[in-house]
Amino acid sequence: MDDLPLELLQSLDHKKENHAFRSLKTFEGVDFFSNDYLGFAREELIHEKALEKLHTFPFNLNGSTGSRLLSGNHKAYTELEQTLCETFEVEAALVYNSGFSANMGWISAIIQKSDLVLYDALCHASIRDGLKMSPAKSYKFKHNDLSDLKNKYEQLKKHKNVYLITESVFSVDGDFAPLDELKVFCETHQIRMIVDCAHSAGIYPYNYKQYFLSIVTFGKSYGVHGATLLCSQNIKDYLVNHSRSLIYTTALDPFTIYKIQAAIELSRSVKAEKLRVKLSECISHFLKIAEDLNLMAYLLNSNSAIQGINCKDNAQAIDLQNYLQQHKFALAAIRYPTVAKGEERIRVVLHAFNTKDEIKRLLEAIHSYFQS
């Protein structure tokens, strides 16, 4: 079998030299790095309810057998999308295989050459890659900076259609977008606003129908897999006809769809509300202990479940990751080029199932590292 071209092999060597080489690993220890915010991924009820429904499915138990526009659009999809409309109080929902394919799919289909896109500088890679596939002009504005957004718009506003893309909770920094202020700005200038709610859906309530389009993923707080776009029926109809990442891929299997259905139903329960309260308490406890240990200078400015320990470079981020793993904590370093140079960090994700003792021991280990 032929090997990679020399220049590509050299690029791997360059990554190794700069502590940026990635490899697939398994991690053991207390979970402080998964996106399973509410613990739904370990919730047996979701699996049991999905399996019960699967046993009533008439055929194709193992796979969807095709694209949603061919044989893959089984009845479980119809039931789920109706549930999503009721849960999120929107006119239409369109399920995709992942959040990445959802963002790639709507951006490449809807955004046209004569359009303008303004997006937050910290938007997810799926949004950036979607914009690369679009012929439109796209410009980033400084993270959560309304002043810079307004300046960019004033310089570039001579376009028929303008779109603004942001996230509700940002996946790396963990901070919240000023959605109310952004919405006022968009309404004033007739800009279509899109919000990626991957890291907030299921935890924080939003008025989804006020946006042109919202993205909700099921692999975070819902603990399963897949994603949905929340939108108008006209947008859904257009995407069914033009979104290539929907049209030309095998649909999700019935069991996966039933697990999403069960997770959405669980998210509306009293049990889920108690888990959201527990998660909020874990966040408060984390910040209090960090302050007690004089660690606030090392922390990101975040009040969400996504926290972070700032490091000076890739090498220190890897070193701290290994140190914490030796202390039986499962965390991962976020390195350049995923983040800018000088912004490397250990990403700490808090969950409703983390105990106060686990949080305290984690922060004590971090304190010990920086004191050594």
Go through each PLM region and give its residues.
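PLP-dependent enzyme catalytic core of the Aspartate aminotransferase-like
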Residues: 2, 42-51, 76, 82, ...
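Conserved N-terminal alpha-helix of the aminotransferase class I/II PLP-enzyme fold
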Residues: 55-99
